[in-house]
Amino acid sequence: MASTDPRRPNVLYVISDDQGSWALGCGGNCEIKTPVLDRLAAGGIRFENFFCTSPVCSPARASLLTGDIPSQHGVHDWIRAGSVGEKRIDYLSGQTLITDVVAGHGYRCALVGKWHLGASDVPRPNFVKWFAHQSGMGPYYGAPMIDLDRPCIVEGYITDVLADAAISFVDGEKNREQPFWLSLNFTAPHYPWIDSHPKAFTDMYDDCRFDSCPQEPPHPWFTGGKPAIERGASERRASLIGYFAAVSAMDAAIGRVLEHIERLGLSQSTLVVFMSDNGMNCGHHGIWGKGNGTRPQNMYDTSVKVPCIISQPGRIPAGAVNRDLLSGYDVFPTLVDYLGLSRDSGREKPGRSFAPVLDGRLSEDDRAVVVYDEYGPVRMVRTSEWKYVHRYPDGPHELFHLTTDAGERENLVGDTAYTDIVTGLRSRLEGWFEKFVNPLRDGVNKGVTGCGQLDRVENAGSQRTVFGAGHLVGADWDLWLEKKDTLK
């Protein structure tokens, strides 16, 4: 059957969509209901300070798959063109993914859910199952999917459909000798939120105060602007009910998959990884959105900090909370090491393996003390005490003293008392990115706006437009306000 060896475990790799670290019960939010994920954390390790590599879906997901930063793999914004059909674009063509590595060591790989890296209608090499969302967002009922290479519209609530597909895949693997790798990528809790989720879950929040989602004045850089906030004020509560319900429905769906794995006797030989692609602001900082919820793009912790839980009963310590600063680019080397696979001796990747943490044997000297982030011309370096955000070519830049200003309210970058801090952090940021950037894919000079990627960055010098200059008819905030189901 599928692997029963704890040292060569199956992998269930679950990624949620637009879920901030604040949107998790075991993360300290007493309003949101996530009992399954809370139990998963109680049986494994919850990572308190885990950061995406870019605060928007496609580049963050590409980094999880490749172990590279956006300015190396070339995906700098959410994929707006090239998902299906004759004009499909494989944005990761020629690059080695973590699934390629594990497949080379005998794993049978499956994708169930969101891909959003182009060419969704062509199964990626080394996948034995490919049930992918056609684009990257859409309605929760009647979702457009690709079943292997066949387009289809699925009936039912997509969160449940994906869980059913995951269970079906595991069932098909139970009598095989090889271990499996199952990427279960939910579209939840990405919008649409209003009138989009089962009543059983929206009813959970009828009496919720939503104190975890502050009502703040609109951020001056908010892409929706003040009129949008004013129009949407009356629907704020309905939006939050939908967002919270989407998380809880996903939590229940994950529970069904975990119960099935347990029923087959595979729990102790299955590594479960749960995280989100990027964070999300639901009114935090006066923003509805993530990194591209403002122009210029932002790097607030609510945008870049994501939930992360890793569990394998009997091997990973139970009930631990790790507070090291870790990033999406650390996942690739960590999984390679944890699974006991051979490392590629080629080009150095930016990530540091935290596999020793999973085995409970990391020393203080080995702990990560800094993380980096990028979104086109916006780059961030963050320590436990300071965050510096640099926007090329000439600002506005930001410096936050996180020890005394965890909410990132007071920008100190113009205060001469902190000149040395800024100089040191900027030098550190520039040196690190210089080491890992591919000059042909450097996001600093590609014109990334937060409005979507239309082509591979290698074509930036041609006559083709690579990055959108403005949102489609129906930007993030339009969908929230007007209850649209898809981008038109």
Predicted feature descriptions by range:
Residues T34-P35, L64, K114, P123, ...:
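Polar, surface-exposed loop/tail segments
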Residues G172, P377-H390:
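Short, surface-exposed beta-strand/loop micro-motifs that present aromatic residues
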Residues A2-P9, S16-I32, P55, Q134-Y329, ...:
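Active-site-proximal cap/lid insertion segments
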Residues H105, R150, S384-W386:
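Well-ordered beta-strand scaffold positions
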Residues C26-C30, I45-D68, H76, L111-V122, ...:
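Short, solvent-exposed turn/loop segments enriched in Gly/Ser/Thr/Pro and often Arg
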Residues P125-N126, I167, V304, S384:
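Short, structured coil segments at secondary-structure junctions
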Residues P9, Y13-S16, G20-A110, K129, ...:
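Active-site segment of extracytoplasmic enzymes that catalyze sulfate/phosphate-ester chemistry
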